[in-house]
Amino acid sequence: MKVRNSLKSLRTRHRDNRLVRRKGRVYIINKTQKRYKARQG
């Protein structure tokens, strides 16, 4: 999992990317392309 400052640019790179909030943190998850998994930090 990558830690990025801004997830908006990452989200637009693949159409299956989902933005989720868990425990006060923002995550990008992608079921089909696992390499797009990231957390905002």
Swiss-Prot record:
One of its GO terms (cellular component) is ribonucleoprotein complex. The keyword Protein biosynthesis does not apply. The gene is rpmJ. This is Large ribosomal subunit protein bL36. HAMAP family: Ribosomal_bL36. The keyword Ribonucleoprotein applies. Keywords: Ribonucleoprotein, Ribosomal protein. It holds the Pfam family Ribosomal_L36. GO terms for biological process: translation.
